[in-house]
Amino acid sequence: MKSGFVSIIGRTNAGKSSFLNALLNEKIAIVSHKQNATRRKINGIVMNGEDQIIFTDTPGLHESNKAINQLLISQAIKSMGDCDLIVFLAPIHDDTSDYEKFLALNPEKPHILVLTKVDESSNAKVLEKITKYQKFQDKFAALLTFSTKQPTYKKPLLDEICKLLPEHEYFYDPEFLTPTNEKEIFREFILEAIYENLSDEIPYLSDAIIKSVKEKTGITEIYASIITERDIHKSMIIGKNGETIKRIGIFARKLIQNLTNTKVFLKLDVVVKKGWSKEEKSLNQIIGY
């Protein structure tokens, strides 16, 4: 019996959240085409035979001078030391530069290099990319390919991961999908709805806070606030006649319902907290680190 923690690491938009959702066969992590959508660590539990793998989705590695982004980067780097194994995701169309930047961080834990999105490339191109990464073979414990759209890639990857995990009793009940508090997942779904329904800088200067969750027979009631930095942003989030916040609510509610399998009542309001994304105290309070 093995049980251990695996940090999913990669650049922004490398598909880390989609990777975790695919392994779980369930959506718990935020997915967006916009950069830096993942702000909090989300854990997912995958059973592979008698072995238990606890995956952690992390913010993407990138370069930025903004306080909020520096906090996210620091948490991703910290997670590399808090795990038993690292899985580094390298999209098949990328060159090796992001992987080389990862190696420059001198990760202490062993890692598996996973070439993702291989369904988007020909076999010849995949083999060519594998050859390019072979020059780093003394750095990684294994090199595998993966596609979230083709389930045949899942089992070989899980088997390889389990080879590198320690012998240990289960950390969690094998029936659990995630040890992450459901409020954290709900707020991530609201944030995803913000990313999908607003453009420009507004999503990056906004976040969500769950005020309360009430479980009633057949329905989950959620009361939440969207935090943003400026009054003009509040007006844009609400939209003309409340149309934008209505779209955000509908989008988020569908995501939550798919996870909870209950009807969901979601009440959103918007709160202005000036400069929250630039102040360490506010960042820690709102993002939760």
Curated annotation (Swiss-Prot):
One Pfam family name is: KH_2
Biological process annotations from GO: ribosomal small subunit assembly
Map out region (G2) in residue numbers.
Answer: 36-40
Domain of life per record: Bacteria
Please give the residue ranges the record annotates as the region G4: 116-119
Gene Ontology MF annotations: GTP binding; GTPase activity; ribosomal small subunit binding; small ribosomal subunit rRNA binding
* Domain Era-type G, first and last residues per copy: 2-167
Q: What is its main location?
A: cytoplasm
Q: Does the keyword Cell membrane apply?
A: yes
Question: NAD as a keyword?
Answer: no
- Which stretches does the entry tag as region G3? 57-60
Renumbered to this chain, region (G1) spans 10-17
Q: Which PROSITE patterns would you find in this protein's record?
A: G_ERA (PS51713), KH_TYPE_2 (PS50823)
Compartments, record wording: Cytoplasm; Cell inner membrane
| One Gene Ontology cellular component | plasma membrane
Domain (KH type-2): give its ranges.
Answer: 194-274
Q: What does this protein do?
A: An essential GTPase that binds both GDP and GTP, with rapid nucleotide exchange. Plays a role in 16S rRNA processing and 30S ribosomal subunit biogenesis and possibly also in cell cycle regulation and energy metabolism.
- Summarize subunit and interaction data from the UniProt record for this chain: Monomer.
Q: Please state which protein family the record places this protein in.
A: Belongs to the TRAFAC class TrmE-Era-EngA-EngB-Septin-like GTPase superfamily. Era GTPase family.
Q: What is this protein called?
A: GTPase Era
